[in-house]
């Protein structure tokens, strides 16, 4: 509760009933959408309030209802103010008065699905995920849509850019959201083949290739979505900037959870039961039953 209260003191704007954040402090530097009311922070805080409400309920704490109400209001305001009906996507809104939504779709727009915050009315947003004009790439998905004029994959400037490169953290959150969508809602925009395609790309990305072409299992910071090169690592090495291996074993991914909870589909429930719903298309593996 103290953590939630501190965030509310510092980042909550009552006029909109939403939290705001700088993109860099959101862990997403040099983004196209930039600072403002972001889908990320509001998804995190709505989910935290909902979780605290459940814990309070189990403890017979009288704060349970207030926290549940707060979680619902954050969720409602997020879709009220950050959903662009024309673009069919959630976007960043600047904190300035009379501001318009930023003109870019960014991968973090899928964050609400990672916490089961989005209703079926918004599933249309997923039609952009596997589209090469938007997010799909050989080592993607990209963190910003590729059709935007500010999309780029740069080897200059700041090492950590969220204006195009693929980030395993963002990919992980997107895959969690996709698994939740496929398990909990009926829609026609994505299916289990899309999940396994994206998950296979994610798994294939977690390597580095040496000068002799030998692949080594590897987790680092951000990826070139078209070549699979670890961008920050290459930039630091080229600049001889210490520590050159600062990104090694970067703890930003959910690989095991995605295999167990998503791919194999072992999903716990509050009823002390396990639901099993594999996201492996029929006939995809001849050794899976």
Regions found by a protein language model. Name each.
Residues 1-9, 48, 52-80, 120-135, ...:
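Extended, well-ordered alpha-helical scaffold segments
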Residues 3-36, 76-166, 207-239:
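Extended glycan-interaction surfaces of carbohydrate-active proteins
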Residues 23-24, 32, 43, 87, ...:
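Solvent-exposed, flexible loop/coil residues
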Residues 32-43, 62-69, 99-103, 158-165, ...:
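Alpha-helix capping and helix-loop boundary segments enriched in small/acidic/polar residues
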């Amino acid at each position: 509760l103290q953590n939630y209260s501190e965030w509310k003191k510092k980042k909550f704007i009552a006029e909109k009933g939403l939290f705001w954040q700088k993109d860099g402090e959101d862990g997403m530097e040099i983004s196209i959408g930039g600072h403002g009311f972001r889908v990320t922070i509001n998804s995190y805080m709505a989910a935290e309030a909902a979780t605290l409400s459940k814990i309070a309920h189990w403890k017979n704490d009288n704060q349970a209802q207030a926290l549940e109400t707060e979680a619902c209001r954050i969720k409602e305001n997020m879709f009220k103010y950050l959903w662009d009906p024309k673009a069919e996507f959630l976007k960043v809104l600047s904190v300035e008065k009379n501001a318009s939504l930023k003109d870019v779709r960014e991968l973090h727009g899928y964050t609400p699905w990672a916490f089961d915050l989005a209703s079926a009315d918004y599933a249309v947003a997923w039609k952009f995920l596997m589209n090469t004009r938007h997010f799909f790439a050989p080592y993607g998905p990209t963190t910003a849509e590729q059709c935007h004029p500010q999309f780029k994959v740069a080897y200059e400037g700041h090492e950590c850019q969220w204006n195009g490169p693929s980030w395993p953290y963002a990919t992980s959150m997107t895959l969690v959201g996709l698994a939740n969508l496929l398990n909990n809602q009926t829609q026609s925009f994505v299916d289990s083949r899309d999940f396994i395609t994206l998950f296979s790309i994610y798994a294939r990305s977690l390597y580095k290739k040496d000068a002799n072409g030998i692949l080594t299992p590897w987790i680092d910071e951000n990826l070139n979505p078209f070549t699979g090169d670890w961008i920050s690592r290459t930039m630091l090495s080229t600049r001889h900037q210490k520590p050159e291996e600062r990104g090694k074993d970067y703890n930003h991914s959910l690989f095991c959870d995605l295999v167990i909870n998503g791919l194999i589909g072992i999903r716990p429930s509050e009823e002390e039961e396990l639901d099993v719903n594999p996201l492996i298309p029929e006939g995809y593996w001849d050794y899976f039953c």
